[in-house]
Amino acid sequence: MKKRIFESTDTNVKKFVFEWGDQPSEKKGVAEAVLYRYGEYRKRTVICCSVMSGCPVGCTFCGTGKFFVRNLTKNEIVEQVRSCLETIDCGTRDIEKFQIMFMSMGEPMLNWKELKLAIIELADMYPTAQLLISTSAPTGMIYHLGELISFSMQIKRLGLQFSVHESTDEARAKLIPTNTCTLRQIAAMGDTWAAFTGRKPFFNYCVNTDNNGADDARRLASLFNPDVWECTLSVICEKDESVANSINRQLDIIEGFRKAMEDEGFHLRVFNPAGQDDIGGGCGQLWYFQKWLKSNL
């Protein structure tokens, strides 16, 4: 395995790139993980890691595109986290808020077998870590919700987030062309998760010029009960747009939409776009993967 580290000028964000295939026993593949520091590592540390090399889902804004190389193994997922933590200046037990999120490259629920094993190992290695699965909710997920809930009873620090991004199924299907659950099905899964686990589900919403109106906020509130759900508003740099232009434009849009969502009763958080402008630290910006594809496939 080869490992490269790219550090943002922000100094609070590092991207880790892992390449496999230089040994006869390794299958070719590349994955990216991002390490975030909020103030100090001791205060809050977040790792976003990959579950696949590439992704078959094909979200239209994502730099991974429709390219899929292979699923990552349990060991390859765990190695991303371990490598990131080698570079911080404290032990994980000293971190006030430590989060491991499966939301960099790949759809977690399409590599559930290996991800489940990785979560078990990571929960044992890092007993203070909060773990989060972020999913687009592929169609088959609805049939495996019971298994996921049962597993979450074993791993009680496991959270669940859905990539929603639009307030109607028609608009969402254009953004995420692969078959996924409907918004009502996603809402029902999250409600069930909350009822059985006692943990609030999250939905992630990428705000753009076409989905930030009061009608969007009302539709979301009618689907996702604000008393049950938490919402994250995200700045996403589309693969063909200037990062600086994207961030400035979308942060302005988010401020207006935040008020509409708060009026509907939602408790919100806004994703910090640190590291998107120079190392591609955000979703949809996996530029090293695209470069690797040109050389290897």
Task: Give each language-model segment a name.
Residues 51-58:
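Cysteine-centered iron-sulfur cluster-binding motifs in ferredoxin-type domains/subunits
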Residues 43-47, 60-196, 200-209, 230-234:
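Core AdoMet radical
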Residues 37, 161-164, 272-274:
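Residues at the C-termini of beta-strands that transition into short coil/loop
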Residues 49, 71, 180, 247-251, ...:
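Short, conserved loop/turn and helix-capping segments at secondary-structure boundaries
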Residues 37, 53, 63-66, 237:
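A short beta-strand motif that forms part of the nucleic acid-binding face
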Residues 1-51, 83-94:
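N-terminal [4Fe-4S]-dependent radical SAM core
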Residues 1-28, 191-201, 205-297:
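Auxiliary Fe-S-binding modules of radical SAM enzymes
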